[in-house]
């Protein structure tokens, strides 16, 4: 696949079919839609199309230019004279050509000798990178729950004063159950701050995220107390943080109608934790098609 027009057609159709699967359908109708997704090429073809859709925008050049601006105005503080950058899901070696940066490029299925073949989920929370680049990768993770987890792990890779360049399809965020405000609240709950306003295009959303000092210190404390169990403890700590940031009206939006019945004796905090674990991460795959 080399055509940008065809790539957008594939991604749009994939989104549309997945949205239909979320509606009330008969068993036969769901089987038919799954067969159509398979005929389209499934998640593999969608991933290829997502990459092609963004190749025409020089993401690497834009990121390097923006990172230099952040460093020059002290919005990003580097630990050394040569900024330490992690590129997650690298599809080329363009970033590595900038010798003024030390770039570690990884991908689960490396297509180049200079790109390290590594599953990002196997990477320990190093908290030592000046910058992490994750462009059109979260939306390609197959399991819905892991998409939410991936963003949590991205935050754990930068030190206080670092930056995350996160690029997602607009339709991942502007969906029926998620929305920009709710996703922004989710990021704040992870301790993220926007170093500059997000850049929104018709198809993509660019986030420029830093880590607050409170999050950095609490992460270090958690590591010292729990050691290797830190990663598995993220969901509970994230739930507690976000719960303190969101009002009741926002919390109600987290649960789809069919999942609202809970025991009256369940505490609000525990109930929210359950909602977050089971639902919010899945919001990243709610590719809803809004008909006019």
Q: How does the language model describe each region?
A:
Residues 1-80:
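Class I SAM-dependent methyltransferase Rossmann-like catalytic core
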Residues 54, 86-93:
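Class I SAM-dependent methyltransferase "Motif I" SAM/SAH-binding loop
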Residues 82-84, 102:
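Residues that mark the start of a beta-strand
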Residues 92-96, 111-113, 140-141, 172-176, ...:
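Eukaryotic short linear interaction motifs
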Residues 95-127, 133, 142-145:
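Adenosine-cofactor binding site in Rossmann-like domains, unifying the SAM/SAH pocket
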Residues 146-163:
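A short glycine-rich, Lys/Arg-flanked "PGG" loop and its adjoining helix->strand segment in the class I
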Residues 172-217, 227-292:
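Class I S-adenosyl-L-methionine
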């Amino acid at each position: 696949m080399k055509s940008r027009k065809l790539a957008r057609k594939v991604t749009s159709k994939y989104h549309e079919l997945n949205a239909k699967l979320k509606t009330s359908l008969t068993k036969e109708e769901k089987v038919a839609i799954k067969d159509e997704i398979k005929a389209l090429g499934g998640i593999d073809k969608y991933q290829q199309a997502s990459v092609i859709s963004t190749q025409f925008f020089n993401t690497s050049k834009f990121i390097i230019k923006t990172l230099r601006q952040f460093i020059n105005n002290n919005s990003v503080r580097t630990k050394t004279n040569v900024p330490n950058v992690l590129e997650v899901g690298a599809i080329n070696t363009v970033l590595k050509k900038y010798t003024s940066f030390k770039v570690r490029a990884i991908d689960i299925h490396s297509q180049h000798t200079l790109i390290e073949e590594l599953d990002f989920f196997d990477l320990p929370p190093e908290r030592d990178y000046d910058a992490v680049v994750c462009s059109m990768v979260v939306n390609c993770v197959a399991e819905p729950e892991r998409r939410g987890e991936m963003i949590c792990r991205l935050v754990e890779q930068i030190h206080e004063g670092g930056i995350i360049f996160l690029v997602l399809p607009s339709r991942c965020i502007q969906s029926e159950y998620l929305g920009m405000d709710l996703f922004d609240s989710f990021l704040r709950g992870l301790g993220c701050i926007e170093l500059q306003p997000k850049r929104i295009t018709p198809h993509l959303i660019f986030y420029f995220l830093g880590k607050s000092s409170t999050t950095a210190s609490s992460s270090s404390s958690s590591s010292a107390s729990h050691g290797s169990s830190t990663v598995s403890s993220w969901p509970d700590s994230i739930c507690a943080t976000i719960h303190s940031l969101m009002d009741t009206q926002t919390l109600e939006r987290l649960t789809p109608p069919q999942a609202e019945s809970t025991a009256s004796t369940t505490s609000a905090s525990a109930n929210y934790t359950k909602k977050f674990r089971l639902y919010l991460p899945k919001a990243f795959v709610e590719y809803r098609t809004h008909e006019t």
